[in-house]
Amino acid sequence: VSGLLYQKLGGPSVFPPQPKSMGEGIYGGGGWRTSSGTDRYRRSLYTYKKRSMPFALHDTFDGPSHETCVAKRETSNTPLQALTLLNDPFFNEAAQKLGQWAVEQKKEEAQTVKVLFKKCLSRPPDQQEQMALRGFYQKQFNRFKAGELGAEKIAGKGGGEVNQRAAWTALARVILNTDEFI
C-alpha cells in the first residue's frame, strides 16, 4: 500500500529490521545483519530463516513454523500485533511514506482522507468513519502545530510542511492498525 515493497525476484536472503535482542544467545552464534536500501522491503519469502533465530514479525503475525506444510494460516488479533504496528520501524516507515503521499495529493482534506482510506482498505469510508478520520487528522495537526508532539520524528524525511506530513502519517498509522487492514 505504501509503495515500499521491492518487487525484485530471486537473490539472496534479506534481513528486515527486527529487535536486536532476537539474535542474542542463539545456538551457533551470528546476529541479525539488518539489510539496507530496497532489501529492507523485500517479500517475506526472501527473509532469512533460522530455527533458533525466528523473524519476530512472522511470529507476531501468525507465520507458519516452517516445520510442516501448512495449507491454511491461523489468524489472530492480539494486543502484541497492535503494539507492533504502532512501534515497529517497518510499519512507521510505511506510514511515513503514506503521509508523504497524502501531502503530495494536493486535494482538499476530506478528499485526501477518502483516497487514503480507499488506498489502504480498498473501499471508501462511510460517513461516520470519514468524520472520525477528519477529526483525528485535525486534532493531530493542531497538536503538531502547537508543539505538543515532535512532528519531525513522526513525519520522517520528506517534502512539504512537516506538521501536515506528520498529521497524515499519524492518520496512516491509525488506518494501518485496523483489523480490516491486517
Regions from the language model: what does each represent?
Residues V1-V115, G158-I182:
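An acidic, gly/pro-interrupted, aromatic-rich
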Residues V103-A172:
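C-terminal structured "cap/appendage" subdomains that terminate the fold
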